[in-house]
């Protein structure tokens, strides 16, 4: 029933077997009720803390750098580090999902100085890619990438469980001090399963 709560089964005959197993189960199972409460409020970016139910999400930034050997590498960016106009930046959204879920939306706001290297919306994902961290492999789920003026939205019909990574490349186009809302992920089929990252601070850019 947990899977039924977060997945669209459609006309799969397995639904009948699952329903029968519940109806013939113990009385305490039949007495189970689920209540979902939602609260919306406003708070300054700086006070937003990481939170989640069934999901976790983190955003990490990396700058493309060229080593002495001429090979391109990635340097992780931490709060307080200055970036320059023209720098190529990769945003990496690291997601953990407790269960396979249907109809999931990832919303990734961006600072005004960031311009996506690929500004066209379209299909996204379903490849294996090596992470720079510890050389492990990560699955990139398949979905649709919708590029908007201030954010990128990712829509997934099915989102796999466990650890996945979504990435996006940007170029720095303006100098100044910039900030943006936190990245969020949510199951549209069961909205009480969601997560947001903590506020990561301002981004400073120079010419």
Kindly give the residue locations of the regions a language model identified.
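Long, domain-scale non-catalytic interaction/scaffolding regions in large secretory-pathway
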Residues: 1-207
